Amino acid sequence: MSIEQIKKNDIRAFLAQAGITPVKETPTGGMYLSPLRQEDTASFHVDYTKNRWYDHGAGVGGSIIDLVMHMHNIDFLDALCYLEAPGLVRVQ
């Protein structure tokens, strides 16, 4: 699987598979409690149309690869391996 194909994995579905659901949602995006740190007010935004995320409290964002790197404190290559693992929600 190429890096571009991996980046197409749906962030919303990935978060849902991890049990992380939006606090507020519109057709184009959702606000979540950050999966990267403790917080009481949702400041983690996922743009569903661009398949990108941004944590306003931490000042970081990016693709699903960046999200996995931050969530699991792993490097780029380990994140690619993680996202290629069987059982992960995929985009066809």
Describe these PLM feature segments.
Residues 1-92:
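N-terminal structured subdomain of primase-like DNA metabolism proteins
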